[in-house]
């Protein structure tokens, strides 16, 4: 045995197919694990995105009114407009009509003071009568027509107190007293005899009466004298 030499040789055995397949097994498992992790991450991202979109829709839904709410709001708005228009119609139109009626009534009162118990504007009230104090000088007949156009008569004197009052207002004015001649009596516009004394009655040309400073006197009917009108209430 000592004489026999020990022979060392390298055995070149063919590779074992099973071992060759086992080596890549670890790599394959790691790849599969990585793929699973990626897939799981993608699923998580997708789920998170869906949750975010769902929450966003929820928030938007909370902020925006639904279709029935919009309809109700629109109906309420229309009702409010109708009510406002009705209020304006009820308040404005009657007030306008009332104002027109008042203006018409005022004109009627001014033209026909006897029917309402008040004197027209710019007239003076004294002892249940209205007096228009004229500033124009006219003849007796012109003064008579001017007072008639004002729904009144030429100034008449009922008593001494009224004469004093009128003398304070105006020193001189025509009165509604006349005569046909010096041989006829003095009469009023109603044809009644005038009882107060009239000065200068002897002059045949002076057939119309004038109030002058607390007394009555005769004057020519064609003279231009201030006139006053009287209207009994």
From Swiss-Prot:
Phosphorylated. Changing residue 172 to A: Has no impact on the affinity for HLA-E. SMART domains: CLECT (SM00034). One of its GO terms (molecular function) is HLA-E specific inhibitory MHC class Ib receptor activity. Induction: Up-regulated in memory CD8-positive alpha-beta T cell clones upon antigen-specific stimulation. Residues 118-231 form the C-type lectin domain. It is found in: Cell membrane. Changing residue 200 to A: Has no impact on the affinity for HLA-E. The chain crosses the membrane at residues 71-93. A motif (Immunoreceptor tyrosine-based inhibition motif (ITIM)) lies at residues 6-11, 38-43. Its main location: membrane. InterPro entries: C-type_lectin-like, C-type_lectin-like/link_sf, CTDL_fold, NKG2/CD94_NK_receptors, NKR-like_CTLD. GO terms for biological process: adaptive immune response; CD8-positive, gamma-delta intraepithelial T cell differentiation; cell surface receptor signaling pathway; innate immune response; natural killer cell inhibitory signaling pathway; negative regulation of natural killer cell mediated cytotoxicity; negative regulation of T cell mediated cytotoxicity; positive regulation of natural killer cell mediated cytotoxicity. The modification Phosphotyrosine is found at residues 8, 40. It comes from the Eukaryota. One of its GO terms (cellular component) is receptor complex. Changing residue 213 to A: Has no impact on the affinity for HLA-E. Residues 1-70 are cytoplasmic. Residues 1-29 are annotated as: Disordered. Changing residue 223 to A: Has no impact on affinity for HLA-E. Residues 94-233 are extracellular. Keywords: Adaptive immunity, Cell membrane, Disulfide bond, Glycoprotein, Host-virus interaction, Immunity, Innate immunity, Lectin, Membrane, Phosphoprotein, Receptor, Signal-anchor, Transmembrane, Transmembrane helix. Glycans are attached at residues 102-103, 151, 180. Immune inhibitory receptor involved in self-nonself discrimination. In complex with KLRD1 on cytotoxic and regulatory lymphocyte subsets, recognizes non-classical major histocompatibility (MHC) class Ib molecule HLA-E loaded with self-peptides derived from the signal sequence of classical MHC class Ia molecules. Enables cytotoxic cells to monitor the expression of MHC class I molecules in healthy cells and to tolerate self. The cytosolic N-terminus contains two immunoreceptor tyrosine-based inhibitory motifs (ITIMs), which are essential for the association with INPP5D/SHIP-1 and INPPL1/SHIP-2 phosphatases and functional inhibition. This is NKG2-A/NKG2-B type II integral membrane protein. The gene is KLRC1.
């Amino acid at each position: 045995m000592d004489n026999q030499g020990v022979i060392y040789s390298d055995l070149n055995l063919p590779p074992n197919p099973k071992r060759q397949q086992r080596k890549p097994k670890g790599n394959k498992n790691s790849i599969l694990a990585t793929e699973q992790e990626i897939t799981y991450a993608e699923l998580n991202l997708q789920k998170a995105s869906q949750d975010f979109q769902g929450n966003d829709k929820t928030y938007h839904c909370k902020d925006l009114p639904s279709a029935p709410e919009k309809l109700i709001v629109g109906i309420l708005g229309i009702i409010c407009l109708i009510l406002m228009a009705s209020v304006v119609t009820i308040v404005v139109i009657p007030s306008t009509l009332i104002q027109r009626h008042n203006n018409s009534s005022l004109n009627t009162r001014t033209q026909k003071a006897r029917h309402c118990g008040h004197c027209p504007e710019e007239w003076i009230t004294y002892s249940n009568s209205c007096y228009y104090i004229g500033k124009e000088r006219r003849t007796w007949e012109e003064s008579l027509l001017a007072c008639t156009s004002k729904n009144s008569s030429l100034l008449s004197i009922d008593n001494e107190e009224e004469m004093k009052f009128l003398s304070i207002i105006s020193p001189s004015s025509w009165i509604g007293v006349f005569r046909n001649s010096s041989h006829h009596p003095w009469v009023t516009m109603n044809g009644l005899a005038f009882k107060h004394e009239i000065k200068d009655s002897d002059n045949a040309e002076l057939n119309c009466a004038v109030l002058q400073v607390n007394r009555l006197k005769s004057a020519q009917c064609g003279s231009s004298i201030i006139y006053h009108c009287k209207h009994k209430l």
